[in-house]
Amino acid sequence: MGQQKPQIRSTTVLGVLRDGKAALGSDGQMTLGNTVMKHSTRKIRSLYQGKFVTGFAGATADALTLLERFEAKLEAYSGRLDRAAVELAKDWRTDKYLRRLEAMLAVVSSDKALIISGTGDVIEPEDGIVAIGSGSMYALAAARALMKHTTLSAEEIVRESLQTAAEICIYTNDHIAIETL
């Protein structure tokens, strides 16, 4: 038996669109195997002159490589989010080097929310909520409930939902970073 590579679980990223506003946030925990390595990792960033916010889940070096490629696609396609996302997904799926990268991206603009995966998927959820990472399903469930039953802002929904995920998922903490559009 060979030694198994420790699995890196590092994130919960959540994006919400509401009332013409967008917010995307993440927790700050990074774990390696069953050890917390860092509490305040920043996994979100603004792109294309502040018109988009993106977050990543997965292996950090892989995600940063994909973020660089995505930013280049946004530049190449004059900030057209759909086109840049599809072109990145095509490259990611077909390029021999890129398809080995283990990460996912969540992207929001003021009117659109997308998930971009390494399997070539570009997903635009109908409800304007995107969630990726180890605690994503907890954050997604909380965000959907808050969207239906409250008048909280996009930023407040992201904060409360990530807090809920942090209370449930051992790979998610409450060092929350949020960017809004």
From Swiss-Prot:
GO MF, one example: threonine-type endopeptidase activity
Name the InterPro entries for this protein.
ATP-dep_Prtase_HsIV_su, Ntn_hydrolases_N, Proteasome_sua/b, Proteasome_suB-type
Recorded hits in CDD domains, A to Z, give: protease_HslV
What does the entry give for GO biological process? proteolysis involved in protein catabolic process
Identify the GO cellular component terms for this protein.
Answer: HslUV protease complex; proteasome core complex
Q: What class of enzyme is it?
A: hydrolase
PROSITE patterns from the UniProt entry: PROTEASOME_BETA_2
Which catalytic reaction applies to this protein? Answer: ATP-dependent cleavage of peptide bonds with broad specificity
Known Gene3D superfamilies for this protein?
A: Glutamine Phosphoribosylpyrophosphate, subunit 1, domain 1
At which positions is Na(+) bound? 166, 169, 172
EC annotation from Swiss-Prot or TrEMBL: 3.4.25.2
Q: Which UniProt keywords apply?
A: Allosteric enzyme, Cytoplasm, Hydrolase, Metal-binding, Protease, Sodium, Threonine protease
Activity regulation: Allosterically activated by HslU binding.
What Pfam families does the database record attribute to this sequence?
Answer: Proteasome (PF00227)
Which residues does the entry assign to the active site, renumbered to this chain?
11
Q: Main role?
A: Protease subunit of a proteasome-like degradation complex believed to be a general protein degrading machinery.
* PANTHER family for this protein: ATP-DEPENDENT PROTEASE SUBUNIT HSLV, METALLOPROTEASE TLDD
On assembly, the entry states:
A double ring-shaped homohexamer of HslV is capped on each side by a ring-shaped HslU homohexamer. The assembly of the HslU/HslV complex is dependent on binding of ATP.
Q: Family assignment? A: Belongs to the peptidase T1B family. HslV subfamily.
The protein here is known as ATP-dependent protease subunit HslV
Q: Which organism is it from?
A: Chlorobaculum parvum (strain DSM 263 / NCIMB 8327) (Chlorobium vibrioforme subsp. thiosulfatophilum)
